[in-house]
Amino acid sequence: MVPPVQVSPLIKLGRYSALFLGVAYGATRYNYLKPRAEEERRIAAEEKKKQDELKRIARELAEAQDDSILK
């Protein structure tokens, strides 16, 4: 097995700095996008509710026409 290679402290500092900056960026980006995604989900749920209501009404109208006395 090959022994571990000594890495310069400057390179280690650069790597950990990049890691920390990436984590910080991800956290801020997540906090920025989370409210937008919640709003999109809320709007999608409202649209789905409207579509379901329209489908229900159309189905009831179709059933009412099928059950008509004047067949």
Curated annotation (Swiss-Prot):
<dbReference type="GO" id="GO:0005743">
    <property type="term" value="C:mitochondrial inner membrane"/>
</dbReference>
<dbReference type="InterPro" id="IPR008386">
    <property type="entry name" value="ATP_synth_F0_esu_mt"/>
</dbReference>
<keyword id="KW-0813">Transport</keyword>
<keyword id="KW-0375">Hydrogen ion transport</keyword>
<feature type="modified residue" description="N6-acetyllysine">
    <location>
        <position position="34"/>
    </location>
</feature>
<keyword id="KW-0496">Mitochondrion</keyword>
<protein>
    <recommendedName>
        <fullName>ATP synthase F(0) complex subunit e, mitochondrial</fullName>
    </recommendedName>
</protein>
<dbReference type="GO" id="GO:0045259">
    <property type="term" value="C:proton-transporting ATP synthase complex"/>
</dbReference>
<feature type="modified residue" description="Phosphoserine">
    <location>
        <position position="68"/>
    </location>
</feature>
<keyword id="KW-0597">Phosphoprotein</keyword>
<comment type="function">
    <text>Subunit e, of the mitochondrial membrane ATP synthase complex (F(1)F(0) ATP synthase or Complex V) that produces ATP from ADP in the presence of a proton gradient across the membrane which is generated by electron transport complexes of the respiratory chain. ATP synthase complex consist of a soluble F(1) head domain - the catalytic core - and a membrane F(1) domain - the membrane proton channel. These two domains are linked by a central stalk rotating inside the F(1) region and a stationary peripheral stalk.</text>
</comment>
<keyword id="KW-0007">Acetylation</keyword>
<keyword id="KW-0406">Ion transport</keyword>
<keyword id="KW-0472">Membrane</keyword>
<keyword id="KW-0138">CF(0)</keyword>
<comment type="similarity">
    <text>Belongs to the ATPase e subunit family.</text>
</comment>
<dbReference type="GO" id="GO:0046933">
    <property type="term" value="F:proton-transporting ATP synthase activity, rotational mechanism"/>
</dbReference>
<dbReference type="GO" id="GO:0042776">
    <property type="term" value="P:proton motive force-driven mitochondrial ATP synthesis"/>
</dbReference>
<keyword id="KW-0999">Mitochondrion inner membrane</keyword>
<comment type="subunit">
    <text>Component of the ATP synthase complex composed at least of ATP5F1A/subunit alpha, ATP5F1B/subunit beta, ATP5MC1/subunit c (homooctomer), MT-ATP6/subunit a, MT-ATP8/subunit 8, ATP5ME/subunit e, ATP5MF/subunit f, ATP5MG/subunit g, ATP5MK/subunit k, ATP5MJ/subunit j, ATP5F1C/subunit gamma, ATP5F1D/subunit delta, ATP5F1E/subunit epsilon, ATP5PF/subunit F6, ATP5PB/subunit b, ATP5PD/subunit d, ATP5PO/subunit OSCP.</text>
</comment>
<dbReference type="Pfam" id="PF05680">
    <property type="entry name" value="ATP-synt_E"/>
</dbReference>
<keyword id="KW-0066">ATP synthesis</keyword>
